[in-house]
Structure formats: structure tokens, C-alpha cells
Amino acid sequence: TGEKPYSCSDCGKCFTRRWNLSEHRKSHTGQKRFCCSVCGKGFSYHSQMKSHYRTHTGEKPCICSECGKSFTDHAGLRIHQKYHTGVKPFSCSECGKCFTRRSGLTAHLRIHTGEKPYTCTECGKCFTCRTDLARHLRIHTENKPFTCSQCEKSFASHSDLDRHHCLP
């Protein structure tokens, strides 16, 4: 029926099964039970770690039948496919901008509130989202976990690797 009666009291995400909610709740504990063997990044779920690991290998086995774009996991593909349908169920009450994902709306709302809840412990710079802080932290650590398979040059972010054009 599509009904999702089980909702997370921390973030509001809803689930069809109690077990899925129980598994999801583990993500709020902060415990990272699975670590990437390449860069050491921790994850709450094995599936997250496996998907992340593919960013190092470049493997993107999930392919969109509409446009051919590929993804490291099925979740990324499902989110992408919403762009083809044009469905954006999450809208900003301030400006009306709509989003495919709830997390997109949550991050967007911080533009209006000015909230920057993620702070760098090295320099004090603040960020609106966790991924921006994680990318920034690599400046301090010189961690460059994304390596070109052609020339072995390393990059601090996956987007920097994608922009890199190596001629074999």
C-alpha cells in the first residue's frame, strides 16, 4: 500500500517495517562499525561502506535506463531517477524552492536561517552541511583518497577526480 507507519523520532524519516526503523536508528548513535580499507572513513552500515569503497575503485554498476548515467549504489540511482520524473515533493516554506530529497530541503533551509552546525576543529570555520566540512578537513590532513586509475594522481574530493582529464 506504500504506507510507512514507522517514523524516526530523531529525523522524521519513515519506514514500512519496524526492523528498517530499528536499523536506521543506529545511524543516529554516531557509532561507525564499518571502516573503508583505503581511507579509513567510518560508516554505520556495511552497504554505505561498500558504496563508498566504489568511489576509490571508480566502479559504478547501477546504470540509469533513461540517460545512461551510472552510480555506485541503487539508492543513488533511485534518487537520480526522480529527476527524470520531475517529482520534487519537498518544498521550502520560505521561498518555494522544491527538492527531490528531504535532506536537500533541510540543507537549503540553512540558507534562510544562517545556521552552520558543522565546525572545523582545526580552524573554526563553519559549514551548513557535513559533506562540506568533510571536504574542508582534507585541507588540514592532506588526505587525498581519490586516485586516478590512469596516472595515480590523487585528489581530495571525488569531484576533483571527475574534473581531472588524464590522457592515457
Swiss-Prot record:
The keyword DNA-binding applies. Keywords: DNA-binding, Metal-binding, Nucleus, Repeat, Transcription, Transcription regulation, Zinc, Zinc-finger. It is found in: Nucleus. Gene3D superfamilies: Classic Zinc Finger (3.30.160.60). The keyword Repeat applies. It comes from the Eukaryota. SUPFAM superfamilies: beta-beta-alpha zinc fingers (SSF57667). Pfam families: zf-C2H2, zf-C2H2_11. A zinc finger (C2H2-type) spans 6-28, 34-56, 62-84, 90-112, 118-140, 146-165. GO terms for molecular function: DNA-binding transcription activator activity, RNA polymerase II-specific; RNA polymerase II cis-regulatory region sequence-specific DNA binding; zinc ion binding. SMART domains: ZnF_C2H2 (SM00355). One of its GO terms (biological process) is regulation of transcription by RNA polymerase II. GO terms for cellular component: nucleus. Belongs to the krueppel C2H2-type zinc-finger protein family. May be involved in transcriptional regulation. This is Gastrula zinc finger protein XlCGF42.1. It comes from Xenopus laevis.
